[in-house]
């Protein structure tokens, strides 16, 4: 069974001061001027016409130029029609479209809503809206859509901060006033500056030899006590300083590398 478009329902509005319902049926194809509408019918009549257009799914009520004399027999003379200013949300004037090669194809009239096939009509309406959005992708967007896009940009992955550790704080650098060398600790800077000033605050009680660092004085005291706490595990030789033992171990490693070469 084919779809059949139902006739337009008669809007029941008590304040609609029109002669008969033929005005609404005629207004679908009639073009009325926006500046002459207050002299034809009142505010409530405009509201009823607006609801009539919206219910049937017609496009906005475009009103080109014409005169009141071209409307004979549409309005009953027995009912006075007061002049009330129009409001932009009730009657929307037609927008001036720029004349161009694609201007005629861009203007599409919205089809009537088919009450017999509600599901098909609703699906068709959504498809048209999606098509309009796709065609207007390169044109100027509305402010509300722009705000939504701005919010979407803010929530996009590109704007989100990277997870994980926060960036490390800038470390305090201690700069030598003599050579400009940087140090992360003040103690290291103090020891380094003593190389420039030749300051040796740590002195041996036995031989009165001075040292820049306290650990150097501690290692020196092992010489006088003849105590050698750092001993080599391979040859048993003792050393007063750990760094001297480290240099000694490198000699053993070099000997082990030379032995396989001699055997070959």
Swiss-Prot record:
Knocked-out gene: effects: Embryos show a down-regulation of early pronephric markers lhx1a/lim1 and pax2a/pax2.1, and subsequent kidney defects.
Species this protein is from: Danio rerio (Zebrafish)
Tissue expression pattern: Expressed in the germ ring mesendoderm and subsequently in the endoderm and intermediate mesoderm, prior to the expression of definitive kidney or blood markers. At 60 hpf, expressed in the glomerulus, in some patches in the eye and brain, and weakly in the pectoral fin buds.
PANTHER family per the UniProt record, alphabetical: ODD-SKIPPED - RELATED, PROTEIN ODD-SKIPPED-RELATED 1
Single annotated GO MF: zinc ion binding
Location in the cell: Nucleus
Family: Belongs to the Odd C2H2-type zinc-finger protein family.
Function: Transcriptional repressor. Regulates mesoderm versus endoderm differentiation during gastrulation to regulate kidney versus vascular cell fate. Acts upstream of pax2a in kidney development and functions in glomerular maturation, after podocyte specification.
SMART domains with a match to the protein in the record: ZnF_C2H2
Protein name (database record): Protein odd-skipped-related 1
PROSITE patterns xref list: ZINC_FINGER_C2H2_1, ZINC_FINGER_C2H2_2
InterPro entries tied to this protein: C2H2-ZF_Transcription_Reg, Znf_C2H2_sf, Znf_C2H2_type
Organism lineage string: Eukaryota, Metazoa, Chordata, Craniata, Vertebrata
GO biological process: angioblast cell differentiation; intermediate mesoderm development; kidney development; mesendoderm development; negative regulation of DNA-templated transcription; negative regulation of transcription by RNA polymerase II; pattern specification process; pectoral fin development
């Amino acid at each position: 069974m084919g779809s059949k478009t139902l006739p337009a329902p008669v809007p029941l509005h008590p304040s609609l001061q029109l002669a008969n319902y033929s005005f609404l049926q005629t207004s679908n194809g009639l073009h009325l001027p926006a500046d002459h509408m207050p002299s034809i019918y009142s505010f409530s009549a405009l509201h009823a016409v607006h609801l009539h257009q919206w219910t049937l799914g017609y496009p906005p009520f475009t009103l080109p130029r014409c005169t009141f004399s071209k409307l004979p027999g549409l309005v009953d003379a027995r009912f006075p029609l007061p002049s009330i200013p129009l409001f932009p949300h009730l009657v929307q004037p037609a927008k001036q479209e720029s004349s161009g090669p694609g201007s005629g194809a861009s203007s599409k009239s919205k089809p009537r809503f088919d009450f017999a096939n509600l599901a098909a009509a609703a699906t068709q309406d959504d498809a048209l809206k999606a098509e309009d959005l796709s065609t207007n992708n390169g044109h100027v967007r509305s402010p509300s859509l722009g705000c939504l896009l701005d919010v979407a940009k803010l929530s996009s992955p590109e704007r989100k901060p990277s997870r994980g550790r926060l960036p490390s704080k800038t470390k305090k650098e201690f700069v030598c006033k003599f050579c400009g060398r940087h140090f992360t600790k003040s103690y290291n800077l103090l020891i380094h500056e003593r190389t420039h000033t030749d300051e040796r605050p740590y002195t041996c009680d036995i031989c009165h030899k001075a040292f820049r660092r306290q650990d150097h004085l501690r290692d020196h005291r092992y010489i006088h006590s003849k105590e050698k706490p750092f001993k080599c595990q391979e040859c048993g030789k003792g050393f007063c300083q750990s760094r001297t033992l480290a240099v000694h171990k490198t000699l053993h490693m070099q000997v082990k590398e030379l032995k396989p070469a001699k055997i070959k």
